[in-house]
Amino acid sequence: MLEKVQGYIIKIVNHNDNSKILTLYTNKLGKITVAANIPEKLSNGNMGIYDLGNAVNVVLYRKTEDEMYKISEISLLKQYTNMHFDYEKLCILNYVLYAINQNFEENFGDLTFMNFLKLYMRFINETKTEIKKMIFLFDYYFMLINGQIEILPYLNELEATFLEELSTQIVLKKELFDFITPNLIKEMNKFKKNKFKFLDINKELFYN
């Protein structure tokens, strides 16, 4: 049984020298755990293909529905290189991947969120933006798709316009994004702590 999917690598566990257990967030199967056999030597075109956050094309196979998917073929769709060389971007990347892994059940998928994630990852990779604003943006949208939040009464008009565009068209516009206020971020952080198991943005992110 073969399945072709696109997805993001959100977690990696080294099983042994030549195999890994990957958690992927995919367009067709949602969040899934798969096994990957790693060649001893990767070709130059595949160097870094198993880095966290990579967007990949994958062909999966399994003999029965009870069996874990295994990777038959994998190719790199998008590698967000800047995130691995900028500390703040790396913090955001790890935060996002941790949040998806912790709060999405196995096989949960949402194509609207997948489209948002694609734009969001590109935005982080290419833009120098205040880290708290980027975390706020992810938190808001994450809660929105999970039905945890309907309206924020303390939004000003510009913020409301930005979030309306975000939720209906999945549009990231820097000129609107920059109007997100520190007070709104503070309130969202309070709300967030009562709803989700996110980590603080600090060095502990890399060692837990």
Map each language-model feature to its residues:
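Non-catalytic alpha-helical scaffolds and adjoining flexible linkers that form interface surfaces
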Residues: 1-19, 25-29, 34-208
